[in-house]
Amino acid sequence: MTELKMKGDNNQTKRAEDILSDDSLSESLINGKIKENEFQEEELFLAGRIHMAVSSNRIPFGEDQKNLLDQRIIDSINRYKRNKTFAWVGSAASLLVLVGLTIFFQLNNQSDISNFASTITAKSDSDYTQLMLSGKKVIQIDAQESKIAYSGNGKVIKIDAQEKVEQSVEADIASYNTVVVPYGKRTQITLSDNSTIWLNSGSKLVYPVRFADNKREVFLDGEAIFEVAPDKDHPFHVVTRDMEIKVLGTVFDLCAYTDDSTVNTVLERGSVELIYKQGSLFGPTKERMVPGMLAAYDLTNETLLQKKVNTKDYTSWKDGYLVMEKNSLGSIAKKLSRYYNVSIEIESTELAGETFSGYLDLRNSAAQVLSLISEMMDIELEQSDRLIKIRKKQTPG
């Protein structure tokens, strides 16, 4: 946590978070009673100025947001120390105050659907796919592969062409439905605008019962293939925890599991615009994709790299198979673990890094798929209930 050190006052140390909770200190900063030269370091005083600006707005500010703001201020200070080439900015003060206010307004302007998605607590280890309606009714779907289809007005929902559910829709009130797909199951959803989404195992999709007049927006945690109905006047937005994708009409795969360190987007056809953070505090970065490309966004370094790929290698899970091209055993195990809802343990990090290429038929069991891999790699399997252990094959003698 950033510490603000004041000269005098027996070397008392003020932490940055104290600025948010100490109204008297905030008022002193606002009214100029604490002078800049009372702080040991100009940069840290500026951090206090930024926190003061947040406090003066009197907007509720959660602990996670405080910590995120603290860390991003520290990062910006360190970058400024390393590189003082901002000729267009009059001083470090104006630079960092601008940075802080930009962060503050970014943090407090998350979309309604993101805020709503954060309240959903359904787990991915359930035995059922859960359809959560806006009226708090929850429908449990037992099928391993299920289909959900909405009518144009969002009031009628068909489930696997057998069950029909009706819900009330109020024209002027935004209401959301949520589908939570557990590990071991998949779901196909046709939304009220006729866009189709294939949700992979362990995924959550939040979407409006009926889209607003000016925007189509959904929230994804997990992996899904989107076939978006074209509508140039109403762009389709997919929001994740770390990225937003804007499309007009296209087919793409988005893999954004919370426990993964990267967000992968593969564009099969059409055009999308990626909106993401890239180590910059002056707003998000935007980058367009063309068909046949994979965009990998590294959440740790906030960097995005694109490369040309065979898109079928990334979308084939929808059709019941996987195509591996020098994929690590560790990444394959994670995919299979989610798909089949089994635990897969690999003996060592070294073994997890070995690669495999080939075709995997997902109509077979997890053990059968891994057995095929073991025939082509120097590994052996041990299975107990829903746990599969992979280890290096022991040589006789």
State each model region's role.
Residues 82-91, 97-397:
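A residue-level detector for the "anchor" residue at the start of short, highly conserved motifs
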Residues 1-12, 16, 26-124:
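Membrane-interface anchoring determinants
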